UniProtKB/Swiss-Prot annotation:
Gene: purH
EC number(s) from the headed UniProt entry: 2.1.2.3, 3.5.4.10
Lineage: Bacteria, Pseudomonadati, Pseudomonadota, Alphaproteobacteria, Hyphomicrobiales
UniProt xrefs under HAMAP family: PurH (MF_00139)
Name by which UniProt lists this protein: Bifunctional purine biosynthesis protein PurH
Domain writeup: The IMP cyclohydrolase activity resides in the N-terminal region.
Classification via PROSITE patterns: MGS
């Protein structure tokens, strides 16, 4: 394959003599122009940026004056011109390039300050199709890429947060920038245009209902660098995609240390789970460890929901994540701080509750600003060696399913409610998952076992331990409903559930031995329903 090959010398220091400024986000642009003007730098600009700089009383030249071509088509064409791109792309130490510049009257541009139309913001706000398309920047990305390619000679700034460092460089080096800085800004510039194009590509895929586009690009903006990943020897960082889904990526950290990799992973799992329970129906609480629930409950009040969730497995809840579906109040906060907890996340937090949690300065308190809608799918992704698995989020809701009673005995009204509750929780438990529930409270949770029978046994054992801790004569699995997130392949799993005291079972169905399982349920007088929907989670 033929490739383009050209050695380009890279001078360490390049003096800024001419700058092109063309930005949508005008944060700090006048101050930057002022600093450049004071150093005698010639300023070129366009449109609104030109007006802002001129209004500040600074000498600035409109790009159309150097191109000899006016801005046309509502600003769609203004910098797409050889005079501009030649000035950005010319190799200063190449004689042919220099001759071409002289012949065509092209002036070298040493600094480009460019940022883009707010496509991502318009998309996130739900802009209509024509408006969103109109906010796709063309000239901006072209100038950014040209400047970044020629970073041996040109400094490119795409982020107002870099203006201060740039000005420090000029002050420290007599108006010059170092190659290492230009190189770093070029890398950042290409990352910016890549993310911008990814957002556009993904929006088109969504708008046209293309589930599996030929090229899938998932981009993000660095939110924070972490001390380490899942384990201390692993490096990690947190990137946000811009999806406006309330949760750990949008939450405000009201107090506490920086969230760790594991904190973020577990908090996301906890908040997505608790959002399954609509706040207008009842307060709900989910307590999570290692992305699996220790306990989940609803209650007549938020504090009761927390207490009931904690009762399911108070030992495992130590050092866990607490997610609430309603505003954290003082009474609930007072109860929570009695137990060592890593993170609390809620839609919001009262001032009184903040003051109470402040007594535990290491406890991380997050206000998410709302609850995620469990019915909205979006995308989830998982890396594998050399690839990326992408799927829609599991937005299946048991309320939307047509439940099929497959046994002679139909569930009672209370059993049906407990079935639905358990199945909701089971959706968020690592497979194989078995969840016992009674009266809007988990009684026992079995997670992540290779055998479904083992998950059922572990859940029953957890229920027995909880009963002893609470001084109960019998575990809460007695008279409970039990959910399996996938079908029961044999009757042994059902028999284990019956032995634990369950009187009603909810499962997807679909096994070759469904009838065997149904017969066993009928033999023991158990009610069982099929959902027709599986909730594997890995």
């Amino acid at each position: 394959m033929a490739v383009i090959s050209k050695k380009i010398p890279a001078p360490d220091k390049v003096e800024i003599k001419t700058a092109l400024l063309s930005v949508f986000d005008k944060t700090g642009i006048v101050e930057l122009a002022q600093a450049l003007s004071e150093r005698g730098v010639r300023l070129l600009s366009t449109g609104g940026t030109y007006k802002a700089i001129a209004a500040a009383g600074l000498a600035v030249t409109d790009v159309s004056d150097i191109t000899g071509f006016p801005e046309i088509m509502d600003g769609r064409v203004k910098t797409l011109h050889p005079t501009v791109h030649g000035g950005l792309l010319a190799i200063r130490d190449d004689n042919e390039h220099q001759e071409a510049m002289k012949k065509h009257g092209i002036e070298g541009i040493d600094l480009a300050v460019i940022n883009l139309y707010p496509f991502e913001e318009v998309r996130a706000a739900g802009g209509d199709y024509p408006t969103t398309v109109e906010n796709i920047d063309i000239g901006g990305p072209a100038m950014i890429r040209a400047s970044a390619k020629n970073h041996a000679y040109v400094t490119i700034l795409t982020d107002p947060n870099d203006y201060a460092e740039f000005k420090e460089q000029l002050s420290a080096d007599a108006g010059k920038t170092a190659y290492a800085f230009r190189q770093r800004m070029a890398a950042k510039a290409y990352a910016r245009t890549a993310a911008y194009d990814a957002a556009i590509s993904n929006w088109f895929a969504e708008a046209l209902s293309i589930d599996t586009p030929r090229h899938r690009v998932i981009g993000g903006v660095l939110k924070e660098e972490m001390r380490y990943g899942e384990n201390p020897h692993q490096r990690a960082a947190f990137y946000v995609t811009g999806e406006k889904r309330p949760g750990v990526s949008t939450a405000v950290l009201l107090q506490g240390k920086q969230l760790s990799y594991n904190n973020i992973n577990d908090t996301d799992a906890a908040y997505e789970l608790v959002a399954e329970f609509l706040p207008e129906r009842a307060p709900a609480c989910a307590i999570i460890k290692h992305a699996n629930p220790c306990g989940v409950a609803t209650g007549s009040s938020l504090i009761e929901a927390y207490q009931r969730a904690l009762a399911c497995d108070s030992v495992s809840a130590f050092g866990g994540i607490i997610a609430l579906n309603q505003i954290l109040d003082a009474e609930t906060a007072e109860e929570i701080v009695k137990l060592f907890t890593e993170v609390i996340i809620a839609p919001d937090v009262t001032e009184e509750a903040k003051a109470i949690v402040a007594r535990k300065p290491n406890l991380r308190l997050l206000s998410a600003g709302g609850l995620p809608d469990p019915r909205v799918a979006g995308l989830t992704a998982k890396t594998v060696s050399g690839g990326l698995l992408v799927q829609s989020r599991d937005n299946g809701m048991v309320e939307d399913l047509e439940l099929k009673v497959v046994t002679r005995r139909a569930p009672t009204g209370q059993e049906l409610e407990d079935m639905k509750f358990a199945f909701k929780v089971g959706k968020h438990v690592k497979s194989n998952a078995v969840v016992y529930a009674k009266d809007g409270q988990t009684a026992g949770i079995g997670a992540g076992q290779m055998s479904r029978v083992d998950s059922a046994r572990i859940a029953a054992l957890k229920a027995e331990e909880a009963a002893k801790a609470l001084g109960l004569a019998v575990p809460m699995t007695k008279g409970s409903a039990v959910a399996s997130e996938a079908f029961l392949p044999f009757a042994d799993g059902l028999l284990s559930m019956i032995a634990a005291g369950a009187t009603a079972v909810i499962q997807p169905g679909g096994s070759m031995r469904d009838q065997e399982v149904i017969d066993a349920a009928n033999e023991h007088g158990i009610a069982m329903v099929f959902t027709g929907m599986r909730h594997f989670r890995h």
